[in-house]
Amino acid sequence: MVMGVVVAVVVVIIGIRTSHGSRADAPDCAVVKCVALTFDDGPGPYTDRLLEILKANDARSTFFMIGNKVAANPAGAKRVADAGMEIGSHTWEHPNMVAIPADDVAAQFAKANDAIVAATGRTPTLYRPAGGLSNDLVRQTAAHYGLAEILWDVIPFDWYNDANTAATRYMLMTQIKPGSVVLFHDTYSSTVDLVYQFIPVLKANGYHLVTVSELLGHRTPGSSYGSRENGPPANQLHDIPAEEIPSLPHTPSPKPMPNFPITDIPGANSGGPNNGA
C-alpha cells in the first residue's frame, strides 16, 4: 500500500513538472527542427487571440509575463497556462534590473513569482530581464528564486515595426534557424497578425513550435541562455505561395488595458512601455 502511494505521488509530481514547460511527447530538438516563439509583456488585450492561433496550430510557446499585469489579469494568465503554454517571469515591473538596488532586484523576482503562482498554480523556472539587461548580481538573485535567464537569438523588432510587418517578416525569414529563440510581444495586434500568417511558413519548413523548456531542457537556476546550439543543420527558410498564407480575419478591437511595464522605481525605467524585451 505504501509503495502504491509513493508511486502515485511520483506520477503526480512528474505530471505537474511535465505540464509546466514541456509535454511528454515533445519532439527531440537535437534531431528535428524546433523553434521557440516567446512573447513578452503580457498578459494583454491580444493574448487570448494569440492563444487561439497557437492552439489551432498545435503550437507551444513561452510567455514571459510582467508580474503586475498578471496580478491585474490573473484569469488571462491562467488561460495561457491551462492551454499548455509555458509562463516565465518578466519581473514585477519591467525595470532596468542592473540599475536598481539589490533589495529591489529580489523584490522584482519575488513579487512576480508570487503573482504567477497565485494566478496559475505554477512556479516559473525561467525569467527574461527587461531589455536583456542583466549582470552577475541579477543572475545570482534569480538563482535564489529558482530562475534561469532566457534571452534570444532572433529579435525581429516587432514593437519598432508595428506599422511595417514586412520588415519584421523579413527578419524572421533570414534569421530563424533550428534552435532559435524568437522574441515577440503579445501587446501588439500586428504581432499577433504576423504570427498567424507566419506559422504556416515555419510548419512548411518542417519546424516544430515548442516552449523554451522543450527546446533547451532543464536549465540551471542563475544560468543564462540565448538559443539551442546543437540541432539539425541550419537552412534558410523557404517562403510559401501567397495563396497559402491565411487571410487575416476581421477581429473587433479589444478593450484597451492599462500599460503597466514602466516601473515606479525612480530612475530605473528600462526604456519605456515596450523597449524591445
Stretch-by-stretch model annotation:
Residues G42, I66-N68, W92, A130-G132, ...:
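Active-site beta-loop-alpha junctions enriched in small/polar residues
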Residues H20-T120, V201, G217:
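Active-site beta->alpha N-cap acidic-glycine motif
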Residues V35-F39, S61-M65, E86-T91, T125-P129, ...:
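Structural recognition of the beta-strand scaffold that forms the well-ordered cores
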Residues A26-C29, N57, V70-A71, S190-G267, ...:
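C-terminal domain-boundary segment and adjacent tail
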Residues A77-R79, D103-V105, T165-A167, S224-R228:
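Short low-complexity, flexible loop/linker segments enriched in glycine and/or proline
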Residues E93-T123, G131-P178, T191-L194:
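Alpha-helical scaffold elements lining the catalytic groove of polysaccharide deacetylases
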Residues L50, V138, F198:
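Aromatic/hydrophobic pocket-lining residues that form π-stacking "cages" and hydrophobic walls in ligand
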Residues M1-G15:
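Hydrophobic membrane-insertion alpha-helices, especially the h-region
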